[in-house]
Swiss-Prot record:
Protein name: Carboxysome assembly protein CcmO
Comment block on domains: Has 2 BMC domains, is thought to trimerize giving a hexamer that may interact with CcmK proteins in the carboxysome shell.
SUPFAM superfamilies xref list: CcmK-like
Organism, as annotated: Synechococcus elongatus (strain ATCC 33912 / PCC 7942 / FACHB-805) (Anacystis nidulans R2)
Gene Ontology CC: one annotated term: carboxysome
Amino acid sequence: MSASLPAYSQPRNAGALGVICTRSFPAVVGTADMMLKSADVTLIGYEKTGSGFCTAIIRGGYADIKLALEAGVATARQFEQYVSSTILPRPQGNLEAVLPISRRLSQEAMATRSHQNVGAIGLIETNGFPALVGAADAMLKSANVKLICYEKTGSGLCTAIVQGTVSNVTVAVEAGMYAAERIGQLNAIMVIPRPLDDLMDSLPEPQSDSEAAQPLQLPLRVREKQPLLELPELERQPIAIEAPRLLAEERQSALELAQETPLAEPLELPNPRDDQ
């Protein structure tokens, strides 16, 4: 007799699970997009296990999962990023302990995110954060795109994700690719036209453009004003001015010196008439 699972752990299309792993986050997103567009499956989410290894998990009927995985494996091998894949028919409910199933189901129940008019998304993965920042800056300056978020997958690998029209995303990814190669090391790029809602829901939620207004925090205690310190008064002392006395003494010395010095006798020049 099998135990009945709670309502939240009875997902739709509970026939099989498909799991595929790649060596790059852009590659796993592109692989997931191909699987969603090739069969009637639901993207549960991703698992990032470090060193750039990323796994996409899909759910649906066994035939749909098999068809989707075949398309996903071919896509990952085309990117040269394929690692492994498997199909789990009739998965048990306790697999949600290691798979992001409950989180995905809660997001489907809320259904608060809207993805209208998403023409394309672009992903650039670099080895090192400075190259990622430079690539994101180049993408935003080269085309009319919006930076959604960024992902870190371990071993220094990080991915920037932008969205916009197909032409703008293509131009932005090309500019970001050159900027990343100039600054550091480029690992992978991806442009996905017309992404489905399941794929957009699997990406991190974008940050709000405007920050929420924060209430003004008034101090709970008002500090008392400290009294000003008074400086002690200094005693006034008379200052003797000796300048006039010194000037008079110098004048008297100059007069005495002039009287003691004899006047020079006049110099007598010879008369030229006496020579005649």
